[in-house]
């Protein structure tokens, strides 16, 4: 009986350990994989402001390039590629949250016209799937299927991101028309400088909050500094906290001014946005255009044949 109780207790403990480990894994993985989209999704109903600015620029302060490539025109109910390129020097290392150096991650938000959406898996060709890799896209909101987000993902592997897009069919969606539509994109590489709550990350420069003399610099056990500034005017002391990551530029006894940089700027990433245009083409218009081209070609052929026939008649009359 005692042996049975012991085995039951061991089994219960193992089950609890596995459950706890699984929960930690899920929570950690979710926080890492969703970090980029959640910052924008939680704070903004729409990622693109009325001014045209994409809200990611509020946290990623450095301006960097981004490029998007889409077909000039697509037919209704067709899967096509939207390729977003986020170029950067892959040799660069960024400051991580713990102050150590690591590789840059990338993320992107793609704002499609109404009606355009992520292609379902069964409609994506093997060629496009190969270009996509193991990426997992999601909608910005459940009711905003035309706005897609991805990231953060490793920049070395995914500096070029292929979105599989399904075009709408005006035959089934009456609010969709055969027109030229704009597409907007935002892409970042590296961590941001400001969190959504307005606080600074450790991936930015820290400035002095007072002018005076640096009376003390205390290096923290887990990294970072406490810098004590003695205000020369009233003698009060101000303590500036520097997190792990940025390199210190000042030393004890140094005279500094208000807003003078206390650290270097460790940021090597940045955010960029761009746009493109795509035409939702009417198949009947394409067929009509092809018919017109065929008619022109046939007319040219008949003219050539008629000309040769006329030349033969003229030649025979001259010989006669």
UniProtKB/Swiss-Prot annotation:
Species the sequence originates in: Helianthus annuus
PANTHER family linked: CYTOCHROME F (PTHR33288:SF10), PTHR33288
An annotated GO cellular component: chloroplast thylakoid membrane
Gene3D superfamilies: 2.40.50.100, Cytochrome f large domain, Single helix bin
Protein name as annotated: Cytochrome f
Transmembrane segments: 286-306
UniProt function note: Component of the cytochrome b6-f complex, which mediates electron transfer between photosystem II (PSII) and photosystem I (PSI), cyclic electron flow around PSI, and state transitions.
Protein family per UniProt: Belongs to the cytochrome f family.
Subunit structure: The 4 large subunits of the cytochrome b6-f complex are cytochrome b6, subunit IV (17 kDa polypeptide, petD), cytochrome f and the Rieske protein, while the 4 small subunits are PetG, PetL, PetM and PetN. The complex functions as a dimer.
Intracellular or extracellular location(s): Plastid, Chloroplast thylakoid membrane
Any one Gene Ontology molecular-function term assigned to this protein's record: heme binding
Binding-site list for heme: 36, 56, 59-60
Membrane topology term: Single-pass membrane protein
Lineage, uppermost ranks: Eukaryota, Viridiplantae, Streptophyta, Embryophyta, Tracheophyta
Gene that encodes the chain: petA
